[in-house]
């Protein structure tokens, strides 16, 4: 389809997915600087929570520098135009977290499940719609299901009340042909008024290309992050995606120069390490492994002497998915024992 003149909503991930490489330790001042910069650049929707969503603070996922309430309560009053979203993964976040987010002024709730487990989202999606929130069903690790399975899961979320469904490439594994096939199939199966979104990771350097293909296939919401700050090799870099959209005539409403300045002047100096496709991040995309596993694997490498990329390959072989972070150390320990005394 032609995309010239098409208007899309870009959704910034810097303050949520970007929490993963920051080990959830963003300060309130960093949150404020990024959020107000994005708002001034014209970004319409900004996600703010622990990297694993509302309620993510735990031994399993990591304790943040501040609570979700503190982050949201700090950012939301500062924004002039942008709205704020929050991620909620059933089993981590609860309906109480959802109500808290609504009370604080969160506009959009994104209820995320593994791509074959949409049935666990009914309670949260239904409540979000009752609360008159913009309600998104977020199908993670979408490379793990074929188009027909994704259609059935998307329709479940739609039936619960979701007004937008996301195809989520959590591993940065998908290539443009697969994105086209799956987004086109799901778009055709949903009601016309239900929006379609795409969330990419840059582990195989496909974030921008996959996002463009998703727009060409009917997606109207695209996730990206300033300077790509996100799990693994990062999310689709927002400033690059905006530049490509400008070239293609896709309307985003985002000022390219201001977006570049947020990325270069605010986000890059915040990074604890460069967000790039290093050998371990590359393996995430190559083996189809959940992007937020990266730092867990790097920590296990130091503890057990097994290389992070070998651990990630093993996690891919086992088919491990988001929520199984506690099994990463177990896998590394098993691999180390197989090689001899630790």
From Swiss-Prot:
Enzyme active site: 20
Molecular-function annotations in GO: 2-isopropylmalate synthase activity; 4-hydroxy-2-oxovalerate aldolase activity; manganese ion binding
A Pfam family of this chain: HMGL-like
PROSITE patterns: PYR_CT
BP term (GO), one: L-leucine biosynthetic process
Keyword Zinc-finger on entry: no
Top EC class for this record: lyase
Site, Transition state stabilizer: residue positions: 16
Cited HAMAP family: HOA
Family from the record: Belongs to the 4-hydroxy-2-oxovalerate aldolase family.
NCBIfam families cross-referenced by the UniProt entry: 4OH_2_O_val_ald (TIGR03217), PRK08195.1 (NF006049)
Protein name per UniProt: 4-hydroxy-2-oxovalerate aldolase
Taxonomic classification: Bacteria, Pseudomonadati, Pseudomonadota, Betaproteobacteria, Burkholderiales
